Structures are given as C-alpha cells and as structure tokens.
C-alpha cells in the first residue's frame, strides 16, 4: 500500500521570490503584510520508509543545510490559508538529480504560498484568491491547489 509523505523546504536566508511577490501584490492593490514561500516535495512511497527524511535532507538539490530548513508536513495537502501551485500537465518524477530514491514510486514538487496580514494572521480567503488569480498562478500552465 502506498502513501504520500510531504516535506517543506524554506529558506533561512532572505527569500527574493517571496519579496518580489510581496512587492508585486502590493502594486496590484492587495493588502498583504508578509509573503511566505516554501517548496513542497511530495514522495509517494511503498510502506513506511522511516529513513526518507534523512534521505531527503541529504539530497543537495532539495536541501542545502547552509540556507534551507527542512520539515516534514502533517499532510500532503495545503493547510488552511495556503495555496500550492503545481504544473498543469505534471508527470511525476521518479528521480532526483538523476538518482532514484529507494522505496519512492513518484515525486512531485509544489510551490506553497501563504499570505499574512500585518498582525501575522492569514489574509482572508477572498484576498488569497485574488492573489492567486492576479499573480501567483498562471492558468495557462499551472493549477492552484487549496485546502
């Protein structure tokens, strides 16, 4: 029986993509206090691979300990207040940097966006939807996945 484990990779250094999104959303008239971005890696595995976290942490193209923080997520779906952007016609990968990962049947990558107000709370769903439609997702080749 297969299941999916999700890992988030965030930057410990300033995130230029999140900064650019913040500036652009402001110019588009959206009231956002902060933008948080993460790469989410989804691994479809057979059984229970207790070593997967250590394996993912050792793959330099996913996680560089000098600038990234790696954490396993509780769910393989976006949290409330979050949107994941994915390629529209995605074919799951089976290799990372040309290497297979034992026990992994499929690998998918998402970009997670969370928009916060000035108090650090999630912006209202309508504001998140506006951001997705106006900037965060290009429907020609991407899909937005919400909670």
Task: Place the predicted regions along the sequence by residue.
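Core nucleic-acid recognition elements
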Residues: 1-147
């Amino acid at each position: 029986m297969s299941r999916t484990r999700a890992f988030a990779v965030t930057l410990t250094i300033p995130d230029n993509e999140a900064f650019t999104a913040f500036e652009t959303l402001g110019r588009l008239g959206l009231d956002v206090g902060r933008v948080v971005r993460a790469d989410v890696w989804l691994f479809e595995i057979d059984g229970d691979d207790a070593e997967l976290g250590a394996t993912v942490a050792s793959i330099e193209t996913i996680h560089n300990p000098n600038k990234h923080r790696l954490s396993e997520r509780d769910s393989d779906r976006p949290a409330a207040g979050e949107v994941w952007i994915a390629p529209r016609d995605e074919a799951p990968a089976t290799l990372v940097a040309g290497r297979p990962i034992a026990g992994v049947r499929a690998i998918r990558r998402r970009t997670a966006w969370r928009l916060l107000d000035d108090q650090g709370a999630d912006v209202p769903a309508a504001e998140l939807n506006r951001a997705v439609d106006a900037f965060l997702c290009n429907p020609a080749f991407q899909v937005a996945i919400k909670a």
